[in-house]
Amino acid sequence: MSPISTKLMRRRRYEMNNTKFNDLLIKQRGVYNRMKEEQNSGEKNLVVCFTGHRNIAHAVAMQLPSLLDRVLVGLCEQGATVFRTGGAIGFDTVAALKVLELKERYPHIRLELILPCRNQTEYWEETAVRTYRYILEHADSHRYLFDSYVDGCMQERDRRLVDGSDICVAYCNRSRGGTAYTFAYALRAGVEVINLHDLLD
């Protein structure tokens, strides 16, 4: 392929991604307008939850923090105040760390952890456990749904994350598993869903 063709392909990809992101901003403005109407009628502020895969390809993992930054800054600027995550390895961890980072710019926002059980980290590697403890220590609140693991506790955690949320920021590229379950549950509940998978290169 000639250098000119390669350059054109890169330009088209850049324009496509910018179009996707602009569409996302328009969607966020719609959420914000509805939120302002709710505020005027005495309703609550915007609540955002996260769902995403535990295992994420390295190339994707390298892009997620900057993409999350763009999306979450947009939501913060439009009034989002509460961010909920479920404390899992992978996307949940990336999202929680990004919210903690954004608290330096937006000190009024809150990170809330809704955790399936107290022994969630029992079989995790030590590095992941240390990161989990850091997030737990710096979150504004955390709640355990069960004292120890029981069948269905993960799904209950997923439902609790969505219930009461206005928008769900997801990374979902599969049709099965916990993330797909939460994604579908959010759609059925009428929650706005932003799938970061659709915004990646």
Where in this protein do the model-derived segments appear?
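N-terminal amphipathic/basic-hydrophobic helices that include classical n-h-c signal peptides
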Residues: 1-33
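Acidic/glycine-enriched connector segments
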Residues: 21-200
